[in-house]
UniProtKB/Swiss-Prot annotation:
Signal peptide: none annotated. Transmembrane segments: none annotated. It comes from the Eukaryota. Pfam families: F-box. Residues 1-51 form the F-box domain. PANTHER family: OS05G0510400 PROTEIN-RELATED. Keywords: Leucine-rich repeat, Repeat. This is F-box/LRR-repeat protein At4g29420. It comes from Arabidopsis thaliana (Mouse-ear cress).
Amino acid sequence: MDELPPELWIKILSRINDSESLARCRVASKTLNSLSREVRAVNLICTWSRYLKSRSIVVVTPFKTIFRSLIENSSKIRSISVGVDKALKGMSFDDFNEEDSKDLYLTDVEFVKEWLPRVREDLENLSISDFWIQSCWRKSDILALISSNCSKLVKLEVKNAWLSVVGLTEMPNLRYLTLEFIRLDDENLEKVNDCFPFLQELNLIGVGGLKEPRIHFLHLKSCHWTVSNAPLSLAIVAPNLLELKLKCNKPKSLLVETPKLVQCHLSVEDAEGVSFGEFQDLKTLELVSPDMYRLISNISFGNKIKKLAVDSVKSIEQSERLELGLATILKAFPGITSLSLSPRTWSDIETHFQSQGGLGDMKGTDSLKQITARVQMSDHTNVHQTVSFIRSIVNKYRGLTDMRLMIHQDKDPRVRSNLISTCMMSNPRVRWKWGMWAEGGEDMWV
């Protein structure tokens, strides 16, 4: 041990992700005990097994006590991650009597006051994942405490808590903010917009308490927003946003003004109130909606999209399923080179093909090079219909060079083999790639 220089030992100790393991290293030798104080990160998770022990007759050191000890035995901490294991997230109030407990209430201001002043000068990253059963009915003022103490904080992540914004002050150095499964007392996100003016990445996952939220950041580059059912009016105004992942249900109004957007994933149930500003550089687009026909027919996503993924999930009405054809998609996105289709979308456009007796009169595009699809076939007789559909696609779109098709893994192997051999023999100019898919499973290429 003495042969290694201290700097190397500090690097080794810094790679230990679990601070409990680091604590055991301290006990192992005086040298490690001394050097471990130079580690700049504290990472502590309350596991399921530790939780069960704390509820048994076995005497264990309280989780908060261990955490405070780790803070006290370290110097110049730059990163802190403390939380409960994901396995505890699914617990219900009936599982254990947690009504009066606070031992895992990690956004408790009084608890945070015990350790935050010690690390405030150097702290750059802070992640707190609370225990929902103890935190959901206790409003926390932790945001005000953090903003008044941590001037150098660059990255903040809070999960599973009820947060107040009273007393929250501006944090000009914060660049990354994640709020996940949070009840937030900021109905329109006004405080969030005002106090984090230089955010570059924003993740709002399952944030409740919102009414008419409006995201307005001049420097934002990436945004992931999963919206609950409650808000009826949503707005994103971010002139420098490059990546957007937005999932919402049925907003009466959705305004998106992000002219520099390059990559977008949009999931929406009802497209009636959706309004987008002009996209100058949008290259990659993924759409998930049962209202797909109206979404792609009524909204302009720009003419620079190269990669498109379409998932029409369950269509609202049978009549709308019949309207969604391949020509409809390619008319809306004439310049795409790559098209990915979900099982439902493949089924919809094949149904449209069969009902119309072909792909339609629209001129085939030469830009489309690759189609990736999860193929739906209900029975053996559908193989011939599917082959006819595929052959028509390949013949009409002459620029198409790659067909990547996955067949459901429960499909009869003979049916699968018949489809593969027929397609490859009748269309030799195309490069074929075959695979299998299953609901909830990973795609497997063969």
